[in-house]
Structures are given as structure tokens and as C-alpha cells.
Amino acid sequence: MANKYAGTQTEKNLEAAFAGESQARNKYTYFASKAKKEGFEQIAALFLKTADNEKEHAKLWFKELNGIGDTAENLAAAADGENYEWTDMYEGFAVTAEKEGFPALAAKFRMVAAIEKHHEERYRALLKNVEMQEVFKKSEVKIWECRNCGHIVVGTAAPEICPVCAHPQSYFEVNAENY
């Protein structure tokens, strides 16, 4: 996923624009939640509307940086990002927090790092499924569920088309009930 701006100030500007728009989007969704809790529905809705605008602005800059590949590339990039977060970023933050007298925050950084590790593992497992063409076909019998209508199929593969709602195979997932 090379980009034509590599090594330029424009690349740095695009990265900063992407980061700024991404952060604004998240802040505005948090602000919307607070406004809603305080009884300001219109203000909450406007924060969410603006957050959606910021998401689209961020997408413009991310696309310019060729940040969106195919699903396999995106899974690999996501796994790499999560790996950095749990192996380097959060551990470094934890060490600094401890040195500066914030042991509770250091512990929280490490707990989040453990979550990021799980995210990496999940993305790598999904990437393996994509690469092995095992997203919709397994070697063992599985229970498949249509994410649109809930239709259940038992077998080694999800159907090409849901016989109930006619949605494509892409709507099926292995059923995983944990309750």
C-alpha cells in the first residue's frame, strides 16, 4: 500500500489531517453521549452529524495515503498496529507512568495492552481464514447463522445464498453462543 506522498511534508500533513479528523470524530461521539445524558437531544444529534462528517474527512485523507487495501491487507495492517500497541506503545506508557508516580495508570495501560494483544490474535486468525479460503468453509461441521435473518444451517460450508432471506454467503458466520 505505497503512497505517492512518501517522504514528503505533504505526507506528514495528510497523516496529521487524518489523525486530527479521527480524534475529532471520537470526541464528538463522546460529547454527543454527554449531551444526550443531560437532556440535549438536538445537540447530541448535531455532535453525531458532525462526527459523521469528520469520519468522511478522515477517510479522504486515509485514502490519499493508500491506507485502505483489500481485506487481507487491512487485516495484516490492523494486526501490525495492534502488535505495536501492546508490545511497544502501552508498555512504554506504563513504564513512564510508573516512573512519574502513577502506578494505577500504569496498570491500566498494561490491562489495555492485554486487550490489544487479543485484538492482534483475532485479526491474525481472521487473516489466516481469508488466506486459506476458510471464511465460509471449514474442515469440520459447523453451525452457520445468517446475520440478516438468523437462519441456521449445519454443515462444513455456509450456503451461497440464504434460503430464507436471499442474502449472499457473505452474511453467514459460524454461530458462537456463549450464554
Go through the PLM ranges and name each one:
Residues M1-Y179:
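Non-heme di-metal
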